[in-house]
C-alpha cells in the first residue's frame, strides 16, 4: 500500500522503532469514541430542545450550525496552539474545554434559555475541535509510517462505535427523562447526562496529563525541504481539505435525510420509528468497515482503496435515485459501509510529508469539517425543489471528487 506518511517524515517519536505505543493508542482511541459520541448525541438534543422551546426547524438546526461552526472558527487557531504547546498538551486543553462545555449545560438548563444551550454547545464543540487537531496527526506518528492510515482507520472505528452508542444513551437519559409533561422537567433532562460527560472528559484530561504519552519531535526537513512558508503551499493538503469538506458534507447529508427518505411511501414507507431503527445499519456499517479497513489497508494502496469506496458509493447512490422500495432503502444504507475508511484515509494522505507544518495542516483539515453544515443545506434546497429522492444526486458530486483525490489529487 502507499505510505501515507513517508519513512523520512520529520514527525517522529523518540526511539519510535523500538517503543510499543499500544497504551498511548488505546488512550487516544477513547478520545475518538468520545467525540463520536458527543457529535451523534446532537441528533437526540435537536428534537429534545425543539420540543422544550417550541422551535421551528430552522431554529432547531442552529444546534448543528453552532457545532460545525466551532470547527470553522477554532480549527486554525487550534493548529497554532498545538504546534506551540505539543500534541499531548493540546489534547489535555481540548479535554478541559470540552468538559467546561458539558458543564455549561447545567446552568443552561437552570435558566432555560436556548441561547445558553447554543453557547454551551459551541464551547463543547471547540474542545472537540482541539482534540481532533491534536489527536488525528498524533495517531499517524505513533508507530510505523507505512501503517499510519491503518491506525487512523482503527481509531475512527471506535469513533463510529461512539456514534452508534450515543442515540441509545440519549434516548434513555434524555428523552425518557423528559416524559414529564412540564417544560421545567424537560429542560432539566439534559443535566445528568452532560454532567456525566463533563466528569468523563475531566478524568481523561487528568489521565493524559499524568501519563505523559510520548511527545512528537518536529525538527527535520519536511517534504521537498520546504522549511519556510506554511502548510498551504502543499497542493495535496489543499485538495485533501476539499476532500474532507465534501466527505463530511456527504456523510452528514445522507445521514440527515435517512429517516425522511425511508419514511417516504415511494421508498420503504416505514414509520419514523422504524426508519430511525434502520439508520443504525448506516452507522453500524461505517463502524464495521473501519474495523475491517484497519486490517486490510495494511496491504492495500491508500489512494486506490479510497477511490474504490467512492466509486461504490456513487453506484449505490445512482441505484438509490433510480429505484424504490427495499432496493433503494438498502442501497442508501449500504453507503455507510463504504464511507468507513474515507475520513481517516483522506486525512492521512493529506498530511503526507508536511513535517513541521503538520499541526497547521491538521487544523486546515479540521476547518474543512464545516462541510457538514453547508452541503446538507444544499441538499435540503434540492429536496424542496425537486423532491427528496432526486436530492440524493447531490452527494454523488462529493464522492466523485473523493475518487479524484484518491487517484490523482493525493499525489504529492
Swiss-Prot record:
Q: Which InterPro entries match?
A: Glc/Gal_transptr_bac (IPR005964), MFS (IPR011701), MFS_trans_sf (IPR036259), MFS_TsgA-like (IPR050375)
What is the recorded name of this protein?
Glucose/galactose transporter
Query: What protein family is recorded?
Result: Belongs to the major facilitator superfamily. FHS transporter (TC 2.A.1.7) family.
Describe the task this protein carries out: Intake of glucose and galactose.
Keyword Lyase part of the UniProt annotation:
no
Q: Report the subcellular localization.
A: Cell inner membrane
User: What are the entry keywords?
Assistant: Cell inner membrane, Cell membrane, Membrane, Sugar transport, Transmembrane, Transmembrane helix, Transport
The question of whether Membrane is a record keyword is answered with yes
Residue ranges crossing the lipid bilayer per the database entry: 21-41, 62-82, 90-110, 113-133, 158-178, 192-212, 239-259, 310-330, 331-351, 363-383, 388-408
- Top-level lineage group: Bacteria
State the species of origin.
Brucella abortus biovar 1 (strain 9-941)
How does the record classify its membrane topology?
Multi-pass membrane protein
Main localization is membrane
Cite a single GO BP annotation. Answer: D-glucose transmembrane transport
The GO terms describing molecular function are: D-glucose transmembrane transporter activity; galactose transmembrane transporter activity
